[in-house]
Amino acid sequence: MNKIKTDIDGVLIIEPRLFRDARGYFFESFSEREFEEKVTPILGHSVHFCQDNESMSSYGVMRGLHFQRPPYTQSKLVRCVKGRVLDVAVDIRKGSPTYGKHVAVELTEDNHLQFFIHKGFAHGFAVLSETAVFQYKCDNFYHPEADGGISILDDTLGIDWKIPTDHANLSEKDTKHAMLKDFDSPFDINVDLYK
């Protein structure tokens, strides 16, 4: 596993080791031991995943920007197993020097990249291919009462979703999230969300 730090602490791009031959390829999509050895020292704490999710979406679908409020916060490790998505993490930790900034990475079935999103970030993605199958690991179970989000269409975030606005397909719930300027974040950079 090769880990790539981004411009925002707590967000990492992970490149798995692929073994290719005439039959195709093989890789470990997740190894708790390797994650603990290589990622934990960067984060400064362990992450223990407990739930795997998978979604299938068509071109233009935009999901996000989601998070779970304390005490049910989630870290995520995400990847695209079929198709292409633009995946984004937005720092929403009050007091963070990168508050409101984002990291975007294209995840595809060909590059096999994974994206680690720290607690205290809003997460979302847009489907760039005809269809996409998206998988993500979470370190806390889903709690609908703690569900939260900021608008995926907030222009002030400066995210180029690579989808024309007239092709964007959002759930009704995602159209109702607040813009960042109207959002009171439940996260603070000085509060350890992993205790």
Predicted regions, residues:
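Conserved metal-binding segment of the jelly-roll/cupin
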Residues: L107-T131
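Non-catalytic, conserved peripheral segments adjacent to functional cores
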Residues: M1-D110, T131, C138-K195
